[in-house]
Regions:
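Short, cationic low-complexity segments
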Residues: 102-122
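Sterically constrained small-residue positions within well-ordered secondary structures
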Residues: 7, 23, 32, 51, ...
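Short, basic/aromatic recognition patches
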Residues: 1-13
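Short, charged low-complexity intrinsically disordered segments located at boundaries
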Residues: 3, 35-38, 79-84
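Short, structured beta-strand-loop surface elements
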Residues: 44-106
């Protein structure tokens, strides 16, 4: 989680994605705070809370400051703690489009990704 904490300084805010019962994605802008091995999001809205009751899997996406930089994508499990949302990360990756280059196979990855270690004891 040390690498993740260091990387977070590059970003101003994130988008939180939750899934509704009808499999519709709900996305809101948030300012997650890393506390130990989890993210704390203050006072999520009623739709986010309702979605968490149906599906606790969430994704946080910190957009890059420009197209040349990485986005940070964190998948996790969310739960409510009083008026806050707690997200325990299950996967974290820095992601950006890779420069155009020929690939040997049609299934080759065409992105520039860096996996970041996350604690599994959330």
């Amino acid at each position: 989680m040390t690498e993740l904490a260091t990387v977070l300084d590059r970003f101003a805010f994130a988008y939180l994605a939750t899934i509704a019962e009808q499999r519709r994605t709900h996305i809101v802008a948030v300012r997650p705070v890393l506390v130990g091995n989890t993210f704390r999001i203050a006072e999520p809205g009623r739709t986010t809370c309702r979605n968490l009751g149906q599906q606790p899997a969430v994704t946080l996406v910190w957009p890059p400051s420009d197209a040349e930089h990485y986005s940070l994508i964190v998948d996790g499990i969310g739960r409510l703690d009083g008026h806050d949302l707690i997200v325990a990360p299950t996967r974290a990756v820095l992601h950006r489009p890779a420069p155009a280059a020929p690939t040997d196979t049609p299934t080759a990855c065409r992105s520039d990704c860096i996996e970041l270690p996350v604690a599994k004891d959330g």
